[in-house]
C-alpha cells in the first residue's frame, strides 16, 4: 500500500492561488489565510447581492439589484468605486443596513479588478464551485450508510467527473500559469 503524502508537502509543489472567491463563511477565510497566505479575498457577488437585497422591501429589490449589477459590471475599478458611491448615496439614508452590508466588504468585493479582465466573470462568484459540491452532497446523503469508504470515494469521483462535462470553459485560460 502506498504511503499517503501529507497535504503540506503537496502544497509546496502546487502553484499558489492569487485569489479565491467565497461567501461570508469566516472559517473559509481563516483557512485561506493559513494555507495560502497572501492570497486576495474575493467576496462572491451572488451571495453579497442576496444579503443586501434581504435587507430591503421586495418592492425596492429590482431597482437595487440593477444598481448592484452596475457596480460589479463596471469596466474598471474606478467606475465600480463611483457606482458604489452612487449606490450608497441613493440608498444609504433610507436603507442603511443594506448600504452597510455592501460597504463593509468593499475591498473584497472589488478584488477581482486586480486581475486580467478575462478572469472577472469567474472570480466574481463562487457558485460554480458550490454547485459541484451540492451535486455530490445531494447524492451522498441519499445513499447514507449504503456505501463503504472506497465506494463512496468512487461515487464522489464519478459525480465530479460527470459534473465537469457541463462546466463552462475558462475565459483567458491561456493566461493561467
Q: Where are each of the predicted segments found?
A:
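RNase H-like nuclease fold core
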Residues: 1-21, 26, 30-31, 35-38, ...
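Intrinsic disorder/low-complexity segments
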Residues: 3, 8-10, 40, 100, ...
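Intrinsic-disorder/low-complexity, polar/charged segments
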Residues: 3-5, 9, 44, 76, ...
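Mobile genetic element proteins and their domesticated derivatives, centered on retroelements
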Residues: 8, 20-23, 32, 47, ...
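Short, surface-exposed helix-loop/turn micro-motifs enriched in polar/charged residues
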Residues: 17-20, 41-44, 60, 79, ...
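Conserved beta-strand -> loop -> alpha-helix junction used to position metal-binding or nucleic-acid-contacting
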Residues: 20-26, 31-67
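Acidic/histidine-rich catalytic cores and adjacent linkers
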Residues: 73-177
Amino acid at each position: 500500500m502506498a504511503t499517503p503524502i501529507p497535504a503540506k508537502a503537496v502544497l509546496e509543489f502546487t502553484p499558489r492561488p492569487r485569489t479565491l472567491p467565497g461567501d461570508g463563511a469566516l472559517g473559509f477565510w481563516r483557512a485561506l489565510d493559513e494555507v495560502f497566505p497572501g492570497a486576495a479575498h474575493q467576496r462572491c457577488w451572488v451571495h453579497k447581492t442576496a444579503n443586501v437585497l434581504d435587507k430591503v422591501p421586495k418592492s425596492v429589490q429590482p431597482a437595487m439589484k440593477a444598481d448592484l449589477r452596475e457596480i460589479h459590471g463596471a469596466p474598471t475599478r474606478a467606475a465600480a468605486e463611483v457606482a458604489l458611491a452612487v449606490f450608497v448615496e441613493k440608498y444609504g439614508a433610507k436603507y442603511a443596513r443594506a448600504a452597510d452590508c455592501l460597504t463593509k466588504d468593499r475591498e473584497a468585493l472589488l478584488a477581482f479588478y486586480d486581475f486580467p479582465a478575462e478572469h472577472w466573470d469567474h472570480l466574481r462568484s463562487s457558485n460554480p464551485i458550490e454547485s459541484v459540491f451540492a451535486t455530490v452532497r445531494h447524492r451522498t446523503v441519499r445513499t447514507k450508510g449504503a456505501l463503504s469508504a472506497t465506494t463512496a470515494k468512487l461515487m464522489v469521483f464519478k459525480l465530479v467527473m460527470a459534473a465537469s462535462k457541463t462546466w463552462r470553459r475558462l475565459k483567458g485560460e491561456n493566461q493561467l500559469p
